[in-house]
């Protein structure tokens, strides 16, 4: 995804959910080289989709990349680079006659988090970024959120995908067939949460 950092008041608009975001396509080798250069680990989850489910997902992604669809109003919590892929996977499965079922592992285990808690996890070691985002997101970010809302953060989405299942009238299977780390850089944000919020 692409932002124009030349947009007036970009950081404030970003935090307030008033920034336009553009879907971009990049060669995998360039993507991998950039992440490795900046010391960011990359995880890959292979989805356990049938040929028809794959076709539906590709069709939706191609539709989303059309010029009239590729720009949308980014929202830091509700419509971002983690929630959009989740929604497209759900939509593609529905079109194939299946349903994506997520567990509620965090809330069922009694874990209580707010949006701000997760933002602080990802901005650890970056006090000015943390202060700026805290200033902009307001008190609504302090309310407890459910597992689905936690998926605005990529590692929470990855965990949710790992525990999700695809269900239909004839089958019930895991969404993720395999997970592996394809670029291994230290420290790993999944362990130390040291990457800043912009890398979400």
Positions of PLM-derived features:
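Generic structural motif
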Residues: 2, 19, 52, 138-140
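Acidic/histidine-rich, surface-exposed loop or edge segments in extracytoplasmic proteins
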Residues: 34-43, 63-69
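Activation targets extended, charge/polar-rich intrinsically disordered C-terminal tails
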Residues: 63-200
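A structural motif
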Residues: 49-64
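Glycine-rich phosphate-binding "P-loop"
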Residues: 46
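Glycine-rich catalytic cores of cysteine/serine-nucleophile enzymes that process amide/ester linkages
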Residues: 1-40
């Amino acid at each position: 995804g692409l932002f124009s950092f030349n947009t007036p008041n970009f950081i404030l608009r970003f935090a307030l959910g008033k920034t336009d975001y553009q879907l971009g396509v990049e060669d995998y080798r360039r993507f991998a080289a950039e992440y490795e250069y900046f010391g960011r680990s990359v995880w890959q989850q292979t989805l356990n989709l049938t040929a028809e489910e794959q076709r539906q997902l590709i069709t939706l992604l191609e539709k989303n990349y059309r010029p009239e669809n590729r720009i949308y109003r980014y929202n830091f919590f509700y419509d971002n680079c983690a929630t959009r892929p989740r929604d497209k996977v759900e939509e593609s499965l529905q079109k194939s006659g299946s349903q994506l079922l997520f567990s509620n592992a965090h809330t069922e285990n009694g874990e209580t988090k707010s949006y701000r808690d997760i933002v602080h996890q990802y901005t650890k070691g970056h006090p000015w970024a943390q202060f700026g985002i805290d200033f902009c997101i307001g008190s609504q970010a302090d309310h407890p959120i459910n597992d689905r809302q936690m998926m605005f953060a990529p590692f929470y989405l990855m965990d949710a995908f790992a525990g999700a299942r695809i269900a239909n009238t004839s089958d019930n299977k895991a969404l993720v067939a395999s997970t592996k780390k394809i670029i291994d850089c230290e420290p790993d944000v999944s362990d130390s949460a040291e990457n800043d919020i912009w890398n979400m």
